[in-house]
């Protein structure tokens, strides 16, 4: 049921308090659809409902459904290998074991997966980098869009689901915020959020039985990214400010192949194109991946992204080529129709000429620390999807594991929340804007946003050094001070909220990177090129201003 305003902002009927889900992508919709049969749910989107990052996912979703050629053990092994020693094996196994059921659930919802009558479950399975078997269910090359449209239609039709567009959460409301005296004597709990109704320019106080963060990653902290404008790390930043730990924030995955074109700098060229035989070449036609990894184009993303970055810098290139012309026109149009159409609209016929590609920030492998039910350190607060650290991705995410994680953990979170009793709610104060005024110059926000994204790209990118990281941290702290001062004196806007969150996440990324004195997975340091025999996740704790479980850091 679509709506422009929550039906229960502060209700006298506490037994009917809704569950508030912040984010309307696959993670949020999975939780909502699994819970809505038993209780009311609000799903909040800060832009239009169709603008979630899920809709941008091309490749597919992992499913161990081919029992003849594939197995859970094989999927787990591939996940462990890609994750470079930091994957929690029990997490990887749990999610792999649930993968077939996740695919079945999507089929039951009506997702029109590309079919193959001879394939397991009647599905055409493709293969992507890092996978030893064909196990990727897909909808041509627009899997995320198809899944998102189906689930969004289901949510729109459900009487117990209220969908909000153009609402953005500012901060979580916890009992420690309500009464500072209880901070040391009473466990902290989340009771709701302050959220900006963007269309009406008004901040509301929203009570909730539980809050679920399904806000996605932080790709917009970088100048070049495959992510939509929604990827500003809102959930990670809010959870951190509320007292939750975050893990492995240094591991930002750069997708190896985003289209290089002046008119379209965020269009991703799916991993599946290399999985089906696409070749990486220098502009002179020379292949180069064999010099970097024996798996060539099928190496994990971190290796391929670094290889492309190395070759671009070595030869002074703006891009390299991804050549799929040898696959044939019919094959390309059947398996990659969206990529073909987008490139044709830009004057590039990929059946006859190679695609110019560059790496771009793509996926946040760390985030809010949760268990396998999505529970965070804060009672009443859950997190699901790219905003989280569950241990699945380790130091590098295996292709197409992300959509799977959203469904498996989302389903588990829904079950756990459904078992909870509605808490005794305190009186939540209204948002106070009596001491602030309308912003005088938006150029401050625009300038600081541009500066942040540039310094993160130049100093905290694919290859890092301590000097670059320290410069970045120094500048980020200055920007945070400026933005916090602005936040305290002027009325909030979406751009201000997002910039505040991006700066919070940028500092977490840099601090985590400085703590990792080795090169592993997505984190490559020229100062520490070696890899330890044993390593641990980087866990930052708000109260301790950052700690690591690694005794060598």
Ranges and model annotations:
Residues 2-9, 14-18, 34, 40, ...:
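Glycine- and aromatic-enriched mobile tails/lids
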Residues 87-100, 135-153, 164, 225-233, ...:
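Short beta-strand to alpha-helix junction loop
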Residues 238, 244-355, 416-423:
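An anion/pyrophosphate-binding glycine-rich loop and adjacent beta-alpha core
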Residues 47-78, 84, 253, 264-267:
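Conserved N-terminal glycine-rich FAD pyrophosphate-binding loop of Rossmann-like flavoproteins
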Residues 210-267, 314, 401-412:
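Glycine-rich loop(s) and the adjacent beta-strand/alpha-helix scaffold that form part
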Residues 20-22, 206-215:
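Short hydrophobic core segments
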Residues 107-202, 214, 258-261:
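Conserved redox-cofactor binding core of oxidoreductases
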Residues 19-43:
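N-terminal Rossmann-like FAD-binding beta1-loop-alpha1 element of flavoenzymes
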